[in-house]
């Protein structure tokens, strides 16, 4: 049976509209089709703690925490993603963090985050320094 993966979405304000919108870069569809063609994936709306019922209903098998938005800049997204992470940890589900998503995992593990300049960070390759010991983040 194909795995079902949820991908979190950033929050943006569309030009000309005074309303926040959940969104996901369009290249995610191509990326997922290339790296995991037999996986069903779905974007996850920012619902805060209500996301727990949503993912339970869809019986998702894991989560990708996507990039966009700084931690702490969107309370609803923060609540959604920490709820998802706690659900994943309770149910031994795999998680993967991209940019902000990796920062979320690092913060949850009480790791160090260093602020970087946007023009140096966005759409650029940058180093990630790992500790020498193994951290089994999602171990049951």
Regions found by a protein language model. Give the residues of each.
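N-terminal beta1-alpha1 cap of cysteine-dependent amidohydrolase-like domains
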Residues: 1-96, 100, 107, 111-114, ...
């Amino acid at each position: 049976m194909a795995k079902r993966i949820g991908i979190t979405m950033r929050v943006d304000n569309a030009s000309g509209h005074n309303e926040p919108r959940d969104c996901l870069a369009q290249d995610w569809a191509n990326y997922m089709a290339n790296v995991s063609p037999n996986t069903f994936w779905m974007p996850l709306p920012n619902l805060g703690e209500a996301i727990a019922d949503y993912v339970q209903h869809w019986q998702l098998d894991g989560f990708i925490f996507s990039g966009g938005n700084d931690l702490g800049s969107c309370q609803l997204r923060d609540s959604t993603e920490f709820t998802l992470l706690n659900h994943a940890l309770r149910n031994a589900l795999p998680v993967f963090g991209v940019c902000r998503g990796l920062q979320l995992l690092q913060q949850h593990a009480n790791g160090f985050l260093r602020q970087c300049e946007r023009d140096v960070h966005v759409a650029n390759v940058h180093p990630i320094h790992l500790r020498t010991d193994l951290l089994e983040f999602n171990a049951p």
